[in-house]
């Protein structure tokens, strides 16, 4: 029905990213050329880094800033810069050399000036990877569920329920674990290709 034809950003992210993941898996399946595989895997790994890891860091930054505000603490540029710096160290580790201005990156990210929503990119990416893996492993039955229970659902239910109907339960750790398992397998293959 027309009343349910709209969709929320989370659903749109899952749909587009699922299709991108399916295309990437298709391209990887079609080539054995080391350089082509390395290029494709690098591209896919960057999607993981920027969407799953980085957006999670952004969401944690938003959460920490909100918690400070809720406690009545003064939040200013100095506080935000310190919180962001600590998160960069946590997420990227001590071996990464940071650009001298990276601590100020928080000030130029437009997402931070809107409602708390960047977590949807990371969770949507995890859901999309889980859906794509389901389609690749189960075939036609998963494609049917993806089309009929996810893509066709619009806003007839909340996104988590729609995904559950399509076979991905976002109330569990499984979708994130599946995404991380794929990331690790891609990283292992990249290591082999670079030898």
What annotation goes with each model-predicted range?
Residues 1-3:
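Catalytic Zn2+-binding segment of zinc metalloproteases
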Residues 5-8, 147-149:
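Conserved short loop/turn motifs at secondary-structure junctions
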Residues 6-36, 44-46, 50, 124:
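Post-HExxH zinc-binding segment in Zn-dependent metallohydrolases
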Residues 18-21, 29, 34, 55, ...:
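C-terminal, non-catalytic "cap/extension" segments appended to globular domains
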Residues 45-51, 56, 64:
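Long, K/E/R/D-enriched contiguous segments that form extended
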């Amino acid at each position: 029905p027309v009343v349910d034809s709209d969709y929320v950003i989370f659903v749109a992210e899952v749909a587009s990213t699922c299709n991108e993941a399916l295309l990437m898996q298709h391209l990887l399946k079609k080539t054995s050329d080391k350089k082509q595989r390395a290029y494709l895997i690098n591209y896919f790994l960057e999607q993981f880094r920027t969407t799953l890891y980085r957006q999670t860091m952004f969401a944690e930054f938003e959460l920490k800033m909100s918690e400070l505000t809720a406690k009545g603490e003064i939040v200013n540029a100095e506080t935000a810069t310190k919180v962001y710096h600590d998160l960069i160290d946590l997420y990227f580790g001590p071996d990464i050399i940071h650009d001298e201005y990276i601590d100020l990156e928080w000030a130029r990210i437009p997402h931070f000036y809107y409602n708390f929503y960047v977590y949807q990119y990371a969770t949507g990416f995890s859901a999309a990877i889980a859906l794509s893996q389901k389609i690749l492993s189960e075939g036609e039955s998963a494609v049917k569920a993806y089309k009929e229970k996810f893509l066709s659902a619009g806003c007839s239910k909340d996104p988590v329920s729609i995904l559950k109907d399509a076979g991905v339960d976002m109330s569990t750790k499984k979708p994130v674990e599946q995404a991380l398992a794929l990331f690790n397998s891609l990283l292992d293959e990249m290591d082999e290709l670079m030898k």
